[in-house]
C-alpha cells in the first residue's frame, strides 16, 4: 500500500515507525517547517523529519497546505492510496482529503466524539477522566468530525500525567493504525458516524492556564498539575517569585483558613484549597531546578499562614 505520512511531534513517531516495520511503501513524509530554538536560534527538525531522514524518505515541508498548487501537484504525482495523519498540526483542504483512493486516515488521541481538538490528552487528565484512548477516523472538512474506523481504550492511572499518558497513547496509536490499515486492505472496515450531540472539545493549552486558583478543590488542582506536565506546568507565587508545582497529592482538611494558606511548612508543604488541601511533593522556584519538597524546604522558608497567590 502506497502511503504519504503527515505528522510532526513525538506522538506521531511510533505510527511512522510501525509503517516502516510493516513494509508499507512510504512515498513521502509531510511535516511542519523547521523551527529555530534556544538561545543560539539553532534550526531544529521535527521528530518525524528526523526519522524520515534516517530512513531516506522524501520530506515535504510546505508553509501552507491550503491554496498551494505546487504542494498539491507533488501529492498528485506521488499518487498515494492513503494519507495517514498523526498530529500534523495543519487543517487539510478538501482537494487533499479527496485525493487518495482510501482517503485520509487520522490517528486521534481520544475516544471520539469526546475531546475533539488540539489537546485531548491534557484535557482528559484535567477533567479527571478514568479512561481515554485512540480513534482512527476518515478525515473530513470538520475538526475531528469524520467517520470513525477503530477505537481502543486505555485506563488513565492515578499517577499519570500528560507526558506519561502521551507516551502510552503514541504507542497505542501505532497499534491501532496498523490494525486499521490491515482491515482497510481486506475491506473489513465499517465506518461509524460520530454522534455530534455527544461531542466535547479539547482546545489548545496556554501558559496562563497553569496559574493555580487555590479556591478550586484540591482534586481539581491536582488534575490540572498532572494535565499540564511537562508543559506549561502549574505555578503559584510566593514573595513575588514564581513557584512551579510538578507533583502533589490531596489530603483531607476541614479548616476555614483562606484558600492558598500554607498549613504546614516544616518538613512538608501543605496548602489549603477551596476543598481539602494539597501536599506539595515536587517544586521548582523561578531560576532554579526542580526538587523534592524536603530538599526545597531545607533552603527555603515559607512561614505557616503565608497565602500563596
Swiss-Prot record:
GO cellular component: cytosol
Keywords in alphabetical order: Protein biosynthesis, Transferase
CDD domains tied to this protein: FMT_core_Met-tRNA-FMT_N, Met_tRNA_FMT_C
SUPFAM superfamilies: FMT C-terminal domain-like (SSF50486), Formyltransferase (SSF53328)
Pfam families: Formyl_trans_C, Formyl_trans_N
Enzymatic reactions: L-methionyl-tRNA(fMet) + (6R)-10-formyltetrahydrofolate = N-formyl-L-methionyl-tRNA(fMet) + (6S)-5,6,7,8-tetrahydrofolate + H(+)
EC number: 2.1.2.9
PROSITE patterns membership: GART
Ligand binding ((6S)-5,6,7,8-tetrahydrofolate): 110-113
Job of this protein: Attaches a formyl group to the free amino group of methionyl-tRNA(fMet). The formyl group appears to play a dual role in the initiator identity of N-formylmethionyl-tRNA by promoting its recognition by IF2 and preventing the misappropriation of this tRNA by the elongation apparatus.
Family: Belongs to the Fmt family.
Protein known as: Methionyl-tRNA formyltransferase
Species of origin: Caldanaerobacter subterraneus subsp. tengcongensis (strain DSM 15242 / JCM 11007 / NBRC 100824 / MB4)
